[in-house]
Swiss-Prot record:
It is found in: Cytoplasm. The gene is gmk. Residues 5-184 form the Guanylate kinase-like domain. InterPro entries: GK/Ca_channel_bsu, Guanylate_kin-like_dom, Guanylate_kinase, Guanylate_kinase_CS, P-loop_NTPase. It catalyses: GMP + ATP = GDP + ADP. Its main location: cytoplasm. This is Guanylate kinase. Disulfide bonds: none annotated. Its EC number is 2.7.4.8. Gene3D superfamilies: Guanylate Kinase phosphate binding domain, P-loop containing nucleotide triphosphate hydrolases. It is an enzyme of class 2 (transferase). Signal peptide: none annotated.
């Protein structure tokens, strides 16, 4: 029986740099995760590609997937749905592949209930003023939406205690190293190592 893969969930408030950190994690030659691409009803930002950054789908398609039980998690955020298709995640974990999710806080709490064995990492900004500057710096949001995102971010930061780890995204390279360290630590936990040796011993009988 194949050892089940790790589910690594990276989450945090809007504007904290989840996407940037995720991209850096996957560019690192020492990482070997599979990335579960999220589905969203929001419009693509400049440079984003369907099937690479997100699956960009209509509201009707997304709501049908919810009704059909095909979403591991989903949330409505600032008027748009975001969520994780279930089938891909289950298939990869069962095959022993580590899966990396980059999702919103609401969605992460749903995954926590569905798959409590996951590793939940909260990405934090150095401070709230820096977070606001990052959101404004995108140049894609009105000030009304910026303020709405900031109010949501304050509530989300209060939920940090529901996560296993917190990583400050001050310098992207530093955040990546910390995430790599967390995953390595989880792979070395005795319950996983014992399980591996039990299978080896069973094979000798």
């Amino acid at each position: 029986m194949t050892e089940r893969g790790l589910l690594i969930v990276l989450s945090g408030p809007s504007g904290v740099g989840k996407g940037t950190v995720r991209e850096a994690v996957f560019k690192d030659p020492e990482t070997s995760f599979d990335y579960s691409i999220s589905m969203t009803t929001r419009l693509p930002r400049e440079g984003e590609q369907d099937g690479v950054d997100y699956y960009f789908r209509s509201r009707e398609v997304f709501e049908q997937a919810i009704k059909d039980g095909k979403m591991l998690e989903y949330a409505e955020y600032v008027g748009n749905y975001y969520g994780t298709p279930l089938e891909y995640v289950e298939e990869k974990l069962a095959a022993g592949v580590d899966i990396f999710l980059e999702i919103e806080v609401q969605g992460a709490m749903q995954v926590r209930k569905a798959m409590p064995e996951g590793i939940f990492i909260f990405l934090t900004p150095p401070d709230l003023s820096e977070l606001k500057n990052r959101i404004i710096g995108r140049g894609t949001e009105s000030m009304e939406v910026v303020e709405e995102r900031m109010e949501t971010a304050k509530k989300e930061i209060e939920m940090m205690a529901s996560y296993d780890y917190a990583v400050v995204n001050d310098v992207v390279a530093n955040a990546v190293q910390k995430i790599k360290g967390i995953v390595e630590t989880e792979h070395l936990k005795t319950e996983r190592v014992i399980h591996r040796y039990k299978k080896m011993l069973e094979g000798l009988q």
